[in-house]
């Protein structure tokens, strides 16, 4: 029998200390990784529920196990809320991750060795959009498109590549692109060559849910997303469609289960249901509007301090800063900012002279800082501190600048906690 006083702290102090240290790190560091966010206590409560014990292979009303009556309620709630949130006709809430959602889409609609046309990882795409090191680049014949020297998608180049390689599927979406994607243009190109248009909106799903970034649902045959990132829910995946093709919906359904996954994670689906309810609240739209405002405010500071911002700005939650002109590496910038309790990630920039593990840039995102309450004035000050640190790399005053910046970071983090006590 389990008792109420059982706890990790007494049973496994080494693990407990790691958990406590991570709690402290999140509270005392400013999180600027574009793919990270903070889940609400309600979401975390659902993840820690007794649904973690339940096997529920199948779908609501069609399970292979008994005792699923409450799991059915949870999953149907998540499905219905996601449909309302995104304007979808079809939703599958079972994918364990965005990558598994993407794998299910490929498996449903195309065959091994079919050609896919996706965005180059080095130009802002994702591993699962056809990178050679990914299953998507090994199982399928992957052709890649990129961005111009100005940091924008060249739709005519996409069209020409599509005409040349005749893909069965065009993959749109990104992990490091700061502008608006013309979903209608991508569908036009897909229709011209008879391809499916598959959109991975993982990075901008929260913005789309709030109506501050254009939705791909009216144009794509199928859309996937993660449920964390801008959406701010648990770590997981989601498949959606509004194409109206019941045959596609059936293929997607069977591609998730039984083709790619067994039992769904019902506790995570419960957390997704909470997340979708939160995203339907009026204040969620204000939050997402502020995410974009904060990103734009930071961009202006970096530009004023003579740092190059790829595409010269942002229309979403993220932007890339290039250090090619400064001769600085993304790895060095990442490390220096980390010493000051500012967390970013090194990122390749277009035509990057450095290797992918070194890079010449960093990616900055505002979902997490905005969620903990940072306003435009706060992120402008933060961007200035970051530039101070970057300017000092290799100079005699570097350690002093790091110490001064860290003190400022700790002060604002104390004033704007992630989880108020």
UniProtKB/Swiss-Prot annotation:
Quaternary structure note: Homodimer.
GO biological process, one term: tetrahydrofolate interconversion
UniProt name for this protein: Serine hydroxymethyltransferase
Function in brief: Catalyzes the reversible interconversion of serine and glycine with tetrahydrofolate (THF) serving as the one-carbon carrier. This reaction serves as the major source of one-carbon groups required for the biosynthesis of purines, thymidylate, methionine, and other important biomolecules. Also exhibits THF-independent aldolase activity toward beta-hydroxyamino acids, producing glycine and aldehydes, via a retro-aldol mechanism.
Site (Plays an important role in substrate specificity): 228
Pfam families linked to this entry: SHMT
UniProt-annotated binding residues for (6S)-5,6,7,8-tetrahydrofolate: 121, 125-127
Broad class of enzyme this protein falls into: transferase
Catalyzed reactions: (6R)-5,10-methylene-5,6,7,8-tetrahydrofolate + glycine + H2O = (6S)-5,6,7,8-tetrahydrofolate + L-serine
Organism: Actinobacillus pleuropneumoniae serotype 5b (strain L20)
HAMAP family per UniProt: SHMT
Protein's pathway: One-carbon metabolism; tetrahydrofolate interconversion; Amino-acid biosynthesis; glycine biosynthesis; glycine from L-serine: step 1/1
Modified residues (N6-(pyridoxal phosphate)lysine): 229
Keywords attached to this entry: Amino-acid biosynthesis, Cytoplasm, One-carbon metabolism, Pyridoxal phosphate, Transferase
């Amino acid at each position: 029998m389990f008792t109420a006083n059982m706890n990790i702290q007494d049973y496994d102090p080494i693990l407990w200390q790691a958990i406590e240290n991570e709690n402290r790190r999140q509270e005392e560091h400013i999180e600027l990784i574009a793919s990270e966010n903070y889940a609400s206590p309600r979401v975390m409560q659902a993840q820690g529920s007794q649904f973690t014990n339940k096997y529920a292979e199948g779908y609501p009303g069609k399970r292979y196990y008994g005792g699923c009556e409450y799991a059915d309620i949870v999953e149907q709630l998540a499905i219905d809320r996601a449909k309302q949130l995104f304007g979808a006709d079809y939703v599958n809430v079972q994918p364990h991750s965005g990558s598994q959602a993407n794998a299910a889409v490929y498996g449903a609609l195309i065959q091994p060795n079919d050609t896919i046309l996706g965005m180059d990882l080095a130009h802002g795409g994702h591993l699962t959009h056809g990178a050679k090191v990914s299953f998507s680049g090994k199982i399928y014949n992957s052709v890649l498109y990129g961005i111009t020297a100005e940091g924008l998608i060249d739709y005519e180049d996409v069209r020409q590549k599509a005409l040349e390689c005749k893909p069965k599927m065009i993959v749109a979406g990104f992990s490091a692109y700061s502008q608006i994607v013309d979903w209608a243009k991508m569908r036009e190109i897909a229709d011209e060559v008879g391809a499916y248009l598959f959109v991975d909106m993982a990075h901008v799903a929260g913005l789309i849910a709030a109506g501050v970034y254009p939705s791909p649902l009216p144009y794509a045959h199928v859309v996937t997303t993660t449920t964390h990132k801008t959406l701010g829910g648990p770590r997981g995946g989601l498949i959606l469609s509004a194409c109206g093709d019941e045959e596609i919906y059936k293929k997607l359904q069977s591609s998730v289960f039984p083709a790619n996954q067994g039992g769904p994670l019902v506790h995570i689906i419960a957390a997704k249901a909470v997340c979708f309810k939160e995203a339907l609240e009026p204040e969620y739209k204000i939050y997402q509007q502020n995410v974009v405002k904060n990103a734009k405010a930071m961009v202006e500071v970096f530009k004023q301090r003579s740092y190059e911002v790829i595409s010269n700005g942002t229309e979403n939650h993220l932007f890339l800063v290039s250090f090619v002109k400064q001769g600085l590496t993304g790895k060095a910038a990442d490390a220096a900012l980390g010493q000051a309790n500012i967390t970013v990630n090194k990122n390749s920039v277009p035509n990057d002279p450095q290797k992918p593990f070194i890079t010449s840039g960093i990616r900055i995102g505002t979902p997490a800082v905005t969620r903990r309450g940072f306003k435009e004035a706060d992120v402008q000050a933060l961007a200035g501190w970051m530039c101070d640190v970057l300017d000092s790399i290799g100079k005699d005053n570097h350690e002093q600048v790091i110490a001064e910046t860290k003190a400022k970071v700790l002060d604002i983090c104390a004033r704007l906690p992630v989880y108020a006590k």
